[in-house]
Design a protein with these regions (language model features):
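Glycine-/acidic-rich phosphate or pyrophosphate-binding loops and their flanking alpha/beta elements
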Residues: 1-13
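TOPRIM fold recognition
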Residues: 13-14, 25-132
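Helix N-cap/beta->alpha junction signal
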Residues: 19-21
Length: 132
């Protein structure tokens, strides 16, 4: 089950932003005005993990790129989900700077900065999170 899965148009939606919950979907769709943009969809996994069935559903729709937009405090879940998705999709992470925030609590400019300046490949994200 993926919330807002129906917004993915087969072979037309190229990029999916994957978030944890319903309010994140609503917030991103509204704040980025994605209502009439068939090439990008925001969907929720209802938590910090993704199942093989959910991955298959995304593949079946012809999605090529996944941006993981889990909450800032979900570092380990992002790494694990990224490893699962990286096998099948071009996978990126929207690295939320403040670990206490999510897209629902962020304003437009904070979201813009996250996607414009903090979008990372999975490898970049993992390297950035190494504690020395």
């Amino acid at each position: 089950l993926l919330y807002n899965y129906d917004s993915i148009i087969e072979d037309e939606t190229d990029t999916v932003i994957l978030v944890e919950g319903v309010f994140d979907v609503i917030a991103l769709t509204r704040k980025l005005n994605l209502y009439n943009n068939p090439s990008v969809a925001v969907v929720a996994t209802f938590g910090k993990k993704i199942s093989d069935t959910q991955i298959y559903k995304l593949q079946a729709k012809g999605v090529h790129t996944i941006v993981i937009g889990y909450d800032g405090d979900a570092t380990e879940a992002i790494k694990k989900t990224g490893d699962q998705l990286n096998e099948y999709f071009d996978c990126y992470v929207a690295d939320i700077e403040d670990s206490s925030q999510d897209f629902d609590s962020m304003d437009f400019w904070e979201i813009y900065d996250t996607f414009a300046f903090r979008l990372k490949t999975l490898t970049e994200y993992k390297l950035n999170k190494i504690q020395i």
